[in-house]
Amino acid sequence: MGRSPCCEKKNGLKKGPWTPEEDQKLIDYINIHGYGNWRTLPKNAGLQRCGKSCRLRWTNYLRPDIKRGRFSFEEEETIIQLHSIMGNKWSAIAARLPGRTDNEIKNYWNTHIRKRLLKMGIDPVTHTPRLDLLDISSILSSSIYNSSHHHHHHHQQHMNMSRLMMSDGNHQPLVNPEILKLATSLFSNQNHPNNTHENNTVNQTEVNQYQTGYNMPGNEELQSWFPIMDQFTNFQDLMPMKTTVQNSLSYDDDCSKSNFVLEPYYSDFASVLTTPSSSPTPLNSSSSTYINSSTCSTEDEKESYYSDNITNYSFDVNGFLQFQ
């Protein structure tokens, strides 16, 4: 036979939106007496409403513990888990979400969660993966945008997505792990060219900084090291007017070639100590100065190159120092 209606279809019962005066009457009565029996409450509270209307008004709008605002991720997880067990029993789901009403949960499910599950390839009715529903392009475009503009926010979304993949011990994972692997693979391939470009830029910057980072001592400092150099007026006769050492070895693309020029003036002695852009010139114990022109080469190439050129580009300073 079923349950009888909460109220008879009587003339004089008001329908439609509630007025502030009616809301206040309902609040005052429940605060004093409690809601008790919803069938008799309207008459006792002096309201021209049916019991169901009073119950819905109180439950969905007037009770003080109603939580307003957006649903948290934990609440979304709970709704999805409970819906997979109970289906569309919104009142039962709302009873397990403090502060949320069944009507609010139902509306949020239809406007947000259901659409999100469809984009993730999850059937919102059976909660099983369906590849024909998966919208990978939407997931990737959203992830790429968040990664380039809001890295921290994207990291939070990634953590939330990972939590959707994990089981809580009582239920199956909400999203098939294979779907996550596919989306992650595509997302990594999408980001790989950018990462490669950034790494190349950083490497080139480091090479440039290393090449220009070695500062050659100034002329005044060199003159203080070799104060007697100014006395040798015929010092230019001891060396060629201009010597160019050019490294012709072939290296990798990220290596550079060094050119060194000894200018025809030697009073400041700076040109004799010209150094390569990426490594300082060693001054050995026998006071012989070697001009080193290899950069970014292996040890074997350096040894071979030095053995061929060390006799050609060295001179003895001891002869000069004896005049002192």
UniProtKB/Swiss-Prot annotation:
Localisation: Nucleus
Further details from the record: Seeds over-expressing MYB74 display hypersensitivity to salt stress during seed germination.
Protein name in UniProt: Transcription factor MYB74
Disulfide bonds: none
InterPro entries: Homeodomain-like_sf (IPR009057), Myb_dom (IPR017930), Myb_TF_plants (IPR015495), SANT/Myb (IPR001005)
Native source organism of the sequence: Arabidopsis thaliana (Mouse-ear cress)
Swiss-Prot/TrEMBL induction comment: Induced by salt stress.
GO-annotated molecular function: DNA-binding transcription factor activity; transcription cis-regulatory region binding
Domain HTH myb-type intervals: 10-62, 63-117
